UniProtKB/Swiss-Prot annotation:
This is Probable transglycosylase SceD. It comes from Staphylococcus aureus (strain Mu3 / ATCC 700698). CDD domains: RPF. Its EC number is 3.2.-.-. Its main location: secreted. Residues 119-137 have a biased composition (Low complexity). It comes from the Bacteria. Is able to cleave peptidoglycan and affects clumping and separation of bacterial cells.
Length: 231
């Protein structure tokens, strides 16, 4: 799910897609249209999620009107994000095969948030979306299951990463803007579709960690990470 609150201020999304390898560029050498890029980032312009801002490798960071913007590409994958200048917003990255289409990531205000876009190996039918945000880098694919701390439910490595970037592992986290809640930042409608009868209609943040873990595993098994990211 999207948009977990971790600190004050604003940080927003990134888009990652496969591109073409090229030269390495640096912000100090670039003649960037900062105003245009800032406006595109603030409005979550889909162009930023569909293609890099230029061919080849580049790594640009600049401040503009109270926000810090970052655009990067290794020539194959590209990413972008922004946050209020001085806020502790982390740069995000992910990998997506060239054959996949990546839809724009969501944009949310209020507190330090950032967002990533991941694409599964094979195209899947879009499942109910959950809001997402995080301050950690995620590139791994789930490889093993292991019981999470404070719970006897086996949670795979990918779900643990999702929980970490959604809420920092806080089972009581609540996003007052989107209403997403709990360790995995479930929206209420999504939670009610996978929660035990006893907890339907109850905020995910009020459910025990083991119940939240079990619901997340159930949701993940029906559609993978697509429940938490737009991919």
């Amino acid at each position: 799910m999207k948009k977990t609150l971790l600190a004050s201020s604003l940080a927003v999304g990134l888009g990652i897609v496969a591109g073409n390898a090229g030269h390495e560029a640096h912000a100090s050498e670039a003649d960037l249209n900062k105003a245009s890029l800032a406006q595109m980032a603030q409005s979550n312009d889909q162009t930023l999620n569909q293609k890099p801002i230029e061919a080849g490798a580049y790594n640009y960071t600049f401040d503009y009107e109270g926000f810090t913007y970052h655009f990067e590409s290794d020539g194959t994958h590209f990413a972008w994000n922004y946050h209020a200048t001085g806020a502790n917003g982390a740069n995000m990255s992910a990998q997506a095969p060239a054959t996949n289409n990546v839809e724009p990531s969501a944009v949310q205000a209020n507190q330090v948030q950032s967002q990533e876009v991941e694409a599964p190996q094979n195209a899947q039918t879009q499942q109910p979306q959950a809001s997402t945000s995080n301050n950690s880098q995620v590139t791994a694919t789930p490889t093993e299951s292991k019981a999470s701390e404070g719970s006897s439910v086996n949670v795979n490595a990918h779900l643990k990463q999702i929980a970490q970037r959604e809420s920092g592992g806080n089972i009581h986290a609540v996003n007052p803007t989107s209403g997403a809640a709990g360790k995995y930042q479930f929206l209420q409608s999504t939670w009610d579709s996978v929660a035990p009868a006893k907890y339907k209609g109850v905020s995910p943040a009020n459910a025990p960690e083991s119940v939240q873990d079990a619901a997340a595993v159930k949701l993940y098994n029906t559609g993978g990470a697509g429940h938490w990211v737009t991919a």
